[in-house]
Amino acid sequence: MSIKILSESEIKQVANSYQAPAVLFANPKNLYQRRAKRLRDLAQNHPLSDYLLFAADIVESQLSTLEKNPLPPQQLEQLNTIEPLNAKTFKRNSIWREYLTEILDEIKPKANEQIAATIEFLEKASSAELEEMANKLLAQEFNLVSSDKAVFIWAALSLYWLQAAQQIPHNSQVENAENLHHCPVCGSLPVASMVQIGTSQGLRYLHCNLCESEWNLVRAQCTNCNSHDKLEMWSLNEELALVRAETCGSCESYLKMMFQEKDPYVEPVADDLASIFLDIEMEEKGFARSGLNPFIFPAEEA
């Protein structure tokens, strides 16, 4: 990995020099509030309004759980500086299962018949069964867990990882410009990338689908294979073009890119989900998605 999380001593060494941060860490409460509002706004007159509103309910349940049951201080001193919270190797606290229970309790009164059946299954699942499904998802074996269950399990895991990321040093530096297609904090996939405004004006940051951190990657470079060639931008509405798909002819993948200058309220997860018809268009052109939205998991293999 090419981005290193700095130790306390290293932070002091670079304290007097300013450079754009390699990693941006989320403000959990603000993130959930903005995402839920954006999902509800995008749901208006949208063909998939019911699912966007369901996603908003999940996000609001994450916020409620965060406020009622915050993650206690963890023993994180001996972590690696490269992917310190690696999703596949980091020993997670079982509190994530409490988060799952609380999220399910919040959603249950609003659930339709199909969602209620999923909730009932997860409520009856043993701790070992839940941990096994979590292990598969964190290992990116998404096809081994049904998508209806994955959404809830991932919501709980993400709430845990987001809070754990608040407890590690928040300074970082780029070691080199290679291998930036995974999150430098937890090693997970991006949802999409965002071209920012404000102090990071014009810089592109990829948004992690697990710990919600963002990391800088130069524009005009494939987010999957690092190629600078055969890159194209696509959109369904060229006039607005708030959300575009960047395709790479070298690896035949794509990832969406969003532009805060066109709408400061754009939100990676919400706007990615709401632009699912752009995904369909890209797949019809033969490109495979290189990222993952926490509300769109692949179908389980039979």
UniProtKB/Swiss-Prot annotation:
Name under which the protein is recorded: Protein FdhE homolog
GO MF term list: ferric iron binding
Keyword Metal-binding annotated: no
Record's subcellular location: Cytoplasm
One Pfam family of this chain: FdhE_C
Family of the protein in this entry: Belongs to the FdhE family.
Gene, per the UniProt record: fdhE
Disulfide bonds: none
Any single GO CC term annotated in Swiss-Prot or TrEMBL for this entry: cytosol
Function, in words: Necessary for formate dehydrogenase activity.
Keyword terms of this UniProt record: Cytoplasm
Main location: cytoplasm
Gene3D superfamilies according to UniProt: FdhE-like domain
GO BP: protein maturation
InterPro entries found in the cross-reference section: FdhE-like_sf, FdhE_C, FdhE_central, FdhE_N, Formate_DH_accessory
